């Protein structure tokens, strides 16, 4: 993994054999201008506000400069719980429209899965033998609706043989939320209260990493098989895009694939 450039963050975990996982940083060799500078990778629909032609050029540069085995499977993310399975047929056909989903799984060698974020939590799942992977866009809505549990269930590997990596996201000392977010978790599960710390009446800091660990463990993963966390997108403007911090912001990608 040492072959990757400085504008790439390689996952800090004991990677299963053949599994590659990384997140891009905003300072990569992109063409987007402020406030999307420079390597903004989404969305081509213009949702993030950047010119679609810039996003397309950035995505092309990403594939070329990282030497990716194939064009990533970009998703139309909607803060939902839909999981896309990338099989050999889907990998082989041209991708004209981004499928609507907030997670993807595959066992196809060389298929590159991608998640776009700018404060939401990107999560990568992998079988310990490297036979299967999944990626998840886990914002607070998705976490509350258990997108992680649904993705674990979509994988063919038994949960005790899975491991997870939590990528850069809004940190627990920077991401303040209101009653709606607090209630979405605590009214369903009182144990989620430990992931919230009061900042002022009716407001809390929320620990997305803690909530993700709770849900992954509930889905059957062991605590020792969950890695990452601790990189705050809001407090690190040099490296990460942040919607909460900047409002108009680009998106960085978390990519995963099974190497040949």
Curated annotation (Swiss-Prot):
- Kindly list the cofactors needed: Cu(2+); Zn(2+)
Name the record gives this protein: Purine nucleoside phosphorylase XF_0940
Under the GO molecular function aspect, what terms does this record hold? adenosine deaminase activity; copper ion binding; oxidoreductase activity; S-methyl-5-thioadenosine phosphorylase activity
**What CDD domains does the record tag this protein with?**
YfiH
Q: Which Pfam families match?
A: Cu-oxidase_4
Catalyses:
adenosine + phosphate = alpha-D-ribose 1-phosphate + adenine; S-methyl-5'-thioadenosine + phosphate = 5-(methylsulfanyl)-alpha-D-ribose 1-phosphate + adenine; inosine + phosphate = alpha-D-ribose 1-phosphate + hypoxanthine; adenosine + H2O + H(+) = inosine + NH4(+)
Q: What is its EC number?
A: 2.4.2.1, 3.5.4.4, 2.4.2.28
Q: Which domain of life is it from?
A: Bacteria
Among InterPro entries, the record links this protein to:
Cu_polyphenol_OxRdtase, Cu_polyphenol_OxRdtase_sf, Cytotoxic_necrot_fac-like_cat
Taxonomically, what lineage is the organism? Bacteria, Pseudomonadati, Pseudomonadota, Gammaproteobacteria, Lysobacterales
Q: Which organism is it from?
A: Xylella fastidiosa (strain 9a5c)
Q: Which NCBIfam families match?
A: peptidoglycan editing factor PgeF (TIGR00726)
């Amino acid at each position: 993994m040492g072959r990757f450039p400085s504008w790439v963050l390689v996952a800090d975990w004991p990677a299963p054999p053949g599994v590659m996982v990384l997140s891009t940083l905003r300072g990569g060799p992109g063409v987007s201008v402020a406030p999307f500078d420079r390597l903004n990778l989404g969305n081509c629909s213009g949702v993030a506000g950047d010119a679609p032609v810039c996003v397309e050029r950035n995505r092309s540069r990403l594939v070329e400069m990282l030497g990716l085995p194939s064009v990533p499977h970009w998703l139309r993310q909607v803060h939902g719980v839909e999981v896309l399975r990338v099989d050999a047929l889907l990998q082989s056909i041209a991708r004209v429209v981004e499928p609507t989903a907030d997670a993807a799984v595959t066992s196809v060698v060389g298929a590159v899965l991608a998640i776009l974020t700018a404060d939401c939590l990107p999560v990568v799942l992998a079988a310990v033998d490297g036979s299967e992977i999944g990626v998840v866009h886990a914002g607070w809505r998705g976490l509350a609706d258990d997108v992680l549990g649904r993705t674990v269930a979509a994988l063919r590997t038994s949960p005790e043989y899975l491991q997870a990596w939590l990528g850069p996201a809004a940190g627990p000392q920077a991401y303040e939320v209101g009653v709606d977010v607090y209630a979405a978790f605590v009214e369903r599960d009182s144990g989620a209260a430990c992931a919230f710390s009061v900042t002022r009446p009716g407001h809390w800091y929320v620990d997305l990493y803690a909530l993700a660990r709770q849900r992954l463990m509930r889905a059957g993963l062991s605590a020792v098989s969950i890695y990452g966390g601790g990189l705050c997108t809001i407090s690190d403007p040099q490296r990460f895009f942040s919607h909460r911090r900047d409002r108009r912001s680009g998106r960085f990608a978390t990519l995963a694939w099974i190497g040949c």
